[in-house]
Amino acid sequence: MRASVMLCAALGGFLFGYDTGVINAALFQMKDHFGFSEHSWQYALIVAIAIAGAFVGAFISGFISAAFGRRPCIAVADALFVIGSVLMGAAPNVEVVLVSRVIVGLAIGISSATIPVYLAEVTSPKHRGATIVLNNLFLTGGQFVAAGFTAIMVVFTSKNIGWRVAIGIGALPAVVQAFCLLFFLPESPRWLLSKGHADRAKAVADKFEVDLCEFQEGDELPSVRIDYRPLMARDMRFRVVLSSGLQIIQQFSGINTIMYYSSVILYDAGFRDAIMPVVLSIPLAFMNALFTAVAIFTVDRFGRRRMLLISVFGCLVLLVVIAIIGFFIGTRISYSVGGGLFLALLAVFLALYAPGIGCIPWVIMGEIFPTHLRTSAASVATMANWGANVLVSQVFPILMGAIGVGGTFTIISGLMALGCIFVYFFAVETKGLTLEQIDNMFRKRAGLPPRFHEEGESGESGAGYREDGDLGRLATEDVCDLSSLGNRVVSFAKAEDAFTEVAMPDRHAVSNKFEERATSSSSDPQSLENQDEVRQAAIKAAPHEPK
């Protein structure tokens, strides 16, 4: 059950990848049909307008996801994917192409902001990184399938048919995912819990083999809603900077200039045949998908920070080499040799990019924010990604035509150098931590006391944490520990009643119970200092015996 749900959810990544990958080869044929060059503003606009749509989609996804849930948000994205793909495949002119690209862009933005959050909320800490990377694997796999299928259509069909079929076929995965929504994909248990649906949340969590006691954080607010103001709080600012900064670095690495414009890059680098640049985009997409698959096994083994550092510094070296070679192509380096060098260097670049800066930003985005702010924060970080993406994608082909390959990649190298500095000083390690531990880590960094207090050894599910100063939540934990109550999760509003049910029948027994809790936390100096206060609070909270 769990594997099928993960695969169905990750289909959104495939749609994201297919629709971003298909435009590379399709545009290379479409430009001849509609009569514009690969360095024209029309060429750049067709790419960039979808990214602008994705920026808007990422913004509105937060409102849909918070108000109606993750599943309806994914359903909206599927509907837009179908409409945009079919409309673009049948487009009679450039204007209709642009409209359909906006629709597809909205779908990409909604999907890219929602699915990493959904996957993070239904996965245990041990497998959370690999699960979110699975979405990236489907994304890069979609780019690979798009490159291969579009190349076949371009080579073996007429100029007005190949690109239309390749784009229109992108509606099929959206239909499949919409079908999966009806029969396989449940709502996020965290979202359900935040809306007060404790029983439904438990039912979903049982199917995923996830301990609902970890999800007590969701009870803090009566609902999850979009509000960007809390993101400016003292313990949230660094998280916003980190998640948004990593998304911007991902785009400034030049990855989507390669995925959108590899045909143009290889053509300018020496592959002057009209078909060869399109065909050679296939091995590049394959390298991206292959090394994203590697990340599934490395992200939870070697950690987020280490993978990021290796990735960004390796990419910087490759970009500098590409820029140097770009200056000498056509002069000291022949086009035949330069084209081969470019192909090899771009392949190595993707091998370094994919398991690090390619997927880790999405993992971190899904991990570092509390439940009630996760949709807002994911919206901001994803908008940062698409904002940087639209800038790079709009400017890149124009720069290629104005200052050539060497000058363009020199600028990208400079941006990547800034990214290396950012990662070195800002990236943190979240490998193996529960969402509560991650929250405490960022609060400590901000000079604030932890929100969750560890009362013993916490398992992978994060049980054993309570929110400091909250007797109601302490009672909720007791309910989670009692098998006789079905491991139920109670909401904050019912916490006092729950405490009464699990407490001992007299004041002295209640006092003894809390003494035992304090003793079990004796390793915490703060707990020792506050034992008397906790004890007295427990006595006051207990029901009095009738006289």
Curated annotation (Swiss-Prot):
Molecular function as annotated in GO: transmembrane transporter activity
Composition-biased stretches (Polar residues): 519-529
Keyword entries, A-Z:
Membrane, Sugar transport, Transmembrane, Transmembrane helix, Transport
Among CDD domains, the record links this protein to: MFS_HMIT_like
- Record-annotated membrane-spanning stretches: 3-25, 44-64, 79-99, 102-122, 137-157, 165-185, 246-266, 277-297, 309-329, 340-360, 386-406, 408-428
Membrane topology, as annotated: Multi-pass membrane protein
Localization, per the record, is: Membrane
Matching entries from Pfam families are given as: Sugar_tr
Which regions face the Extracellular side of the membrane? 26-43, 100-101, 158-164, 267-276, 330-339, 407
Task: Write out the ranges of the annotated region (Disordered).
Answer: 449-468, 510-547
Principal cellular location given in the protein's record: membrane
Chain ranges on the Cytoplasmic side, renumbered to this chain: 1-2, 65-78, 123-136, 186-245, 298-308, 361-385, 429-547
Per the record, what is one GO cellular component? Answer: membrane
The record's comment on protein family reads: Belongs to the major facilitator superfamily. Sugar transporter (TC 2.A.1.1) family.
PANTHER family, sorted:
PROTON MYO-INOSITOL COTRANSPORTER
Q: What is this protein called?
A: Membrane transporter D1
Origin species, per record, is Leishmania donovani
